[in-house]
UniProtKB/Swiss-Prot annotation:
UniProt KW keywords: Endonuclease, Hydrolase, Nuclease, Restriction system
InterPro entries, alphabetized: Restrct_endonuc_II_HindVP
Taxonomic path: Bacteria, Bacillati, Chloroflexota, Chloroflexia, Herpetosiphonales
Species per Swiss-Prot/TrEMBL record: Herpetosiphon aurantiacus
Protein name as catalogued: Type II restriction enzyme HgiGI
Enzyme Commission designation: 3.1.21.4
GO MF terms held by the record: DNA binding; type II site-specific deoxyribonuclease activity
Catalytic activity: Endonucleolytic cleavage of DNA to give specific double-stranded fragments with terminal 5'-phosphates
Keyword Nuclease found: yes
Transmembrane residue ranges: none
Amino acid sequence: AWGKNQFNNAFPIALACFMFSQQIKPIYIRLEKRNTEHNYIAVDQIFQINPLDPQAFFAFEHSYHPYTELIIGKTPAIDVVISNLQNSQIINAFEIKLTAIPDNTTAILSDHLQGCEIVIRPDTIVYLALSIAKIFQQNSSVLLDILDPICARISDWEDVTSIKPMIPVFCELLYTIFDRYQSAQIPILLQPIWKTQGKLSILHENCLDLFVWSNFALAKVFLDASIKPSEKSITRPERTTVWLIKMLYDFAQNGKIDYKRTLDRITFNLKNDKAFAASGMVTRKYMNSPELHNPRIKRHLIKHIIINGGQRYLSPERRLDSAIVSTPSLFEDGL
């Protein structure tokens, strides 16, 4: 059987390859003047290589070595690293989030109000920080000029009472970076969606599609949840905002990011199992589109995505696997 991560990472790449073969462009969610906007973007433009080229190689759960010089310690693994076997060049890397629509919070709503939950892990925020730091690699003093007037005032980054009032200011600092360097944002996260018939584990006829988030657009999700601070303790999105600012400030000062120290020490009594989660009620406003309401890949086309009998390696205890296994007719030749 395929392990959970094997399927959850390999299936989305197979979906992207299939969409490329059919000339169907994923939806690119990017930041434009502090709001998210959608564009269509070709898969080969995302990957920076023809995904069907025999020289295109996909390494799952590997470190992305181009960021090694920006970091203290070992670069954390990312879901997929893409390279060109012809010249051994590492081209790109992405986090992958295979998500179901609707989620529990939107399952009883009509199609145009449904959304999918997305859970972001801490290492994704590390890669988000690295992708921004890369912009300033040749001139980190520019980043320091933006951050230092505020960040230099902070004597203890682990103290809730001193950090909490600063979080809206941190949000504004990040938006200042995004405003000035909008053209430098890059794709960072692949989010395939698979649609079911309400709460049933039955695939919708309009079943699959692919969204791609830029690094700046992904940051907007937790910034929007942080810009008006909660009255009580620091929330996960707020902590994520602090993580990002602290890692960028470290880079601006020292030219490297000590991500393990940041994640391990700045906890605010929250577990580090995830950076933050956003329910379908939240994500739908960023993803709202005809493709979210009616994904473009029909369910009978799954047999062209999972090929060579791959369905026999599925694990039915997982939701998407179960939905596919429960519909064996998907792989009949007549469809």
